Amino acid sequence: PVVSAIRGGSKRVKLYWNKINGVSGYNIYYSTSPNGTYTLAKKISGNSTVKYVKTGLNQKQTYYFKMTSYITNNGYTTESAFTKVLSAKTVSVSSTSKGAKKYANKTKFKKSAAYKKYKALSSYMTYSKSFAIPGLKNTNVAGFASKTMIPKAICQAGGYMLVSAYDSTGKDESVIYILNRASHSYITTLVLPNKANVSCMAYDGKNIWISKGDKVAYFPFSAITKAVTSGGSYSTLSAYTRYFAVQTKVNIMTYYNNTLWIGATNNTASSKMYGYSIVTQNNLCYLTSKYTMAIPSRTTGVAFDKDGYMYMTVSYATNSSKANYISKLYKFKLDLNAPNKSNQILKGSKLKTLTLPPKAENVCVYGSYLYTIYSGSMYSSCKYPVDRVVATKLSSL
């Protein structure tokens, strides 16, 4: 095998390696010196596991790792040559940050370039319902520190507000920050099974649906409540219940009126959303396609309110000097009970267009407010960064 990455965390080290077809498993060895005695840390059965975390180590100490693959046949085991020795030092890891990344308080936020330039903030934002995005200064990813999390999706689920993020450097797993729905205070972090860009997320009343690259995955809402009741600073989700491909790439997702809408973001041409019924058989969910809807290029998020109005963020690039730059909010009125003969839902004309700050990633509706999440504060090229989830009263749109 080839070790693709090694990383030190709090009293732990994690390794990633390439999957090797045809082997029976892997052996991982470690030592406190490069030329010292190596101890077997873990024997892994099967070739599909490509990650290992060694815990219980001393803090602020360098450890050395090497590994082999092995094949077992007719009771005999053959072990490969050792990989190159790689090292990592354990480090202290701070708690996940709760405060805003750039603007520490209301006064500083209202002095920001974005607030001064965009009426979406100065005229439409309800500051008391808006809140700082956690984890942008630091996220404790199961004992490893990430300062490069990009916030992507937001949805309301039960008594919680969920915010997803992925590590832009690819060093750590993606996460969901769990916040109290009413107070918007950060509670804990759920660490996801992989590093996929979790660009969208939805809640159907039983399960959390999430993008996994070009697939859709889901896991039970009970994983959220378990993470909260554990009282820990983080919990880990070992695996999704199920994931599968759909008719489109998965960049946009929302749940409304018993329909899970899934769509792709196309940065140069219009695209489609597909509306699916969720069918449960033998305790597993399946998706049955029933609707389509055309969406503009560069659509990043969609949400519906209880009256059937649809809100859509269309956003691309960090500033207006970039090709194809846009950052808008559109409002439409739909009749979801009147698809055409091709089962296409027609949007009609825009009822409202609002110019937004750059990098509007996603939206959700809860109560009488629309919540818009931004990632601009994580990009140095963004001249008008927003480090908040911005609440806008629906009646103002």
Where would I find each of the regions flagged by the language model?
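Conserved aromatic anchor
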Residues: K11-V23
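Beta-strand-rich modules
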Residues: K54-Y76
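Loop/turn-rich, solvent-exposed surfaces of beta-rich toroidal or solenoidal domains
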Residues: M293-K341
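Extracellular fibronectin type III
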Residues: T72-S95
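Extracellular low-complexity, O-glycosylation-prone stalks/linkers
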Residues: G22-K42, K66
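Beta-strand-rich domains and repeat architectures in extracellular enzymes and scaffolds
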Residues: P134-K171
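Sequence/structural signature of beta-propeller modules
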Residues: S92-A142, K393-L397
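Repeated scaffold domains used in trafficking and secretory/extracellular systems
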Residues: S146-A153, K195-A202, Y243-Y255, P296-F304, ...
